[in-house]
Swiss-Prot record:
One of its GO terms (biological process) is proton motive force-driven ATP synthesis. It comes from Synechocystis sp. (strain ATCC 27184 / PCC 6803 / Kazusa). The gene is atpG. Belongs to the ATPase gamma chain family. It comes from the Bacteria. It is found in: Cellular thylakoid membrane. It is a peripheral membrane protein. This is ATP synthase gamma chain.
Length: 314
């Protein structure tokens, strides 16, 4: 017969665990909202910067301009910037990003291209640090909500690797935020920048909403800015100098958006994992309660049988 006290203790233990997972789910949801607000707050600057660069590139011929970040070289070494999180309990977020990085590194090595890693997040640092990889730099224990200063620090180190010709290309591997239950590790080339110039692509923003008592994500497509400078506008400085001054801001902004997407993906994965854990805990509590009631009923029945048997023996 099951031990009633043991079952009772386990029910209480699972209830306590459920309280923790539910609290973690709500905290992750609040942080997803903060990530959403940060993306929205940085949009005006990002839009203005994209507009300036987009119009500058229409006035310049990059084929005739010697800008280091646009230099196309035969790739002999490639730097991979791998973005993961600092903590676990977020489903397959970290594992999927690391697997994609390993897959890309293997593809490059099979082509005879050397690979250097720049790691963001404790999970990537721990994993690749124990294996035979050339780690050029690592960044761990960053702010949970990425900020521009951290993005600028990482971007500067990547620019230094590329401009010094330590590497001939820089690729970014991060997790694109799709929805609360879906995220996708993607590979994006950071350097060299496109020789055809900077484009002004359409963008998307996300919003966390509640529907039917559950969290959901709405994605909104944002059209690229179409305004342009007057053709007769005169620059006090050489447009090339203006472009060189704005490129660091552009690089930082591109990296910041990727870090924001990765942070949102991690928080969404954690929220989903904790939601599933809470649901599983609820089911386990129901199963244990049923077992407890059955055991208690069996114990009462046994006691009654013993009493009746004792009475009949008199």
């Amino acid at each position: 017969m099951p031990n009633l006290k043991a079952i009772r203790d386990r029910i209480q233990s699972v209830k306590n665990t459920k309280k923790i997972t539910e609290a973690m789910r709500l905290v992750a949801a609040a942080k997803v909202r903060r990530a959403q607000e940060q993306v929205l707050s940085t949009r005006p600057f990002a839009d203005a910067l994209a507009q300036v660069l987009y119009n500058l590139q229409n006035r310049l011929s990059f084929a005739e301009t010697e800008l280091p970040l646009f230099e196309q070289r035969e790739p002999k070494a490639v730097a991979l910037l791998v973005v993961t999180g600092d903590r676990g309990l977020c489903g397959g977020y970290n594992v999927n990003a690391i697997k994609r990085a390993e897959q890309r590194a293997k593809e490059l090595k099979n082509q005879g291209i050397a690979v250097k890693l720049v790691l963001v997040g404790s999970k990537a640092k721990q994993y690749f640090g124990r294996r035979d990889y050339d780690v050029a730099a690592s960044y761990a224990n960053l702010e949970q909500i990425p900020n521009a200063s951290e993005a600028a620090q990482i971007a500067d180190s990547l620019v230094a690797l590329f401009v010094s010709e330590t590497v001939d290309r820089v690729e970014l591997i991060y997790t694109r935020f799709v929805s609360l239950i879906s995220s996708q590790p993607v590979v994006q080339t950071l350097f060299p920048l496109s020789p055809q110039g900077l484009e002004a692509p359409d963008d998307e923003i996300f919003r966390l909403i509640t529907r039917g008592g559950k969290f959901q994500v709405e994605r909104e497509k944002v059209e690229a800015p179409v305004e342009s400078f007057p053709q007769d506008m005169i620059f006090e400085q050489d447009p090339v100098q203006i472009l060189e001054a704005l490129l660091p801001l552009y690089n930082t902004n591109q990296l910041l958006r990727a870090l924001q997407e990765s942070a949102a993906s991690e928080l969404a994965a954690r929220m989903t994992a904790m939601s599933n854990a809470s649901d599983n805990a609820g089911q386990l509590i129901g199963t244990l309660t049923l077992s407890y009631n059955k055991a208690r009923q069996a114990a009462i029945t046994q006691e009654l049988l013993e009493v009746v048997a004792g009475a009949n023996s008199l």
